[in-house]
């Protein structure tokens, strides 16, 4: 079982169990805000099966394909591309996305979508009321697992609800302060294989 795209999709390798989509007018408006007001930022949209962006030669596009292994496809214009199952809109900046979005983008859209930083480069926008925590709770009910039988790990703001939905939760030591405060415990940083160290104790 997999939780993907900030909790918007819960699936097996062959079947989608739960999916939440962004209203078209919301992600279209977000795209226009980025185009018109954030010239140093890029953006892409995600569906349950692939992502779409406008420039295959951009730094963002190459990172998503080369480092993350995304199935991301180039289209000439996101706003003119027929797609009805957008689950996430993401803004990209190479070093300060949250700061770039703070003056206009976030205040404009935070009442219409769940917006959270997922690293210095990314601001993820999900449907309202949808996050990794709602996905964890869906899985707990689906599998008959109690919160006390659940362990989660996180490092960024989009992980907080997930940490709060588990009986045992860890923030890696390099996580943001808000995430460390939300988790019940901490573990070593990701470059020290902190998550793996904890998982080995379960075996």
Outline where the language-model segments fall:
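Conserved acidic, metal-coordinating active-site core of Asp-based
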Residues: 29, 33, 40-153, 174
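Alpha-helical substrate-recognition element adjacent to the catalytic core
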Residues: 1-14, 18-24
């Amino acid at each position: 079982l997999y939780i993907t795209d900030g909790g918007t999709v819960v699936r097996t390798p062959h079947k989608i169990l739960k999916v939440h989509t962004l209203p078209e007018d919301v992600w279209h408006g977000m795209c226009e805000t980025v185009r018109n007001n954030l010239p140093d930022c890029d953006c892409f949209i995600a569906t349950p099966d692939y992502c779409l962006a406008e420039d295959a030669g951009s730094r963002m596009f190459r990172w998503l394909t080369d480092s993350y292994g995304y199935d991301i496809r180039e289209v000439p214009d996101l706003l003119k591309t027929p797609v009805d199952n957008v689950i996430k809109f993401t803004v990209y900046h190479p070093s300060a996305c949250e700061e770039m979005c703070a003056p206009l983008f976030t205040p404009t859209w935070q009442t219409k979508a769940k917006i959270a930083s997922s690293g210095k480069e990314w601001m993820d926008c999900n449907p309202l009321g949808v996050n990794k925590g709602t996905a964890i709770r869906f899985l707990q009910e689906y599998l008959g697992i109690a919160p006390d039988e659940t362990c989660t790990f996180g490092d960024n703001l989009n992980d907080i609800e997930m940490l709060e939905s588990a009986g045992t939760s860890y923030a890696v030591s390099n996580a943001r302060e808000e995430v460390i405060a939300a988790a019940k415990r901490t573990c070593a940083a990701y470059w020290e294989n902190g998550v793996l160290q904890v998982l080995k104790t379960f075996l």
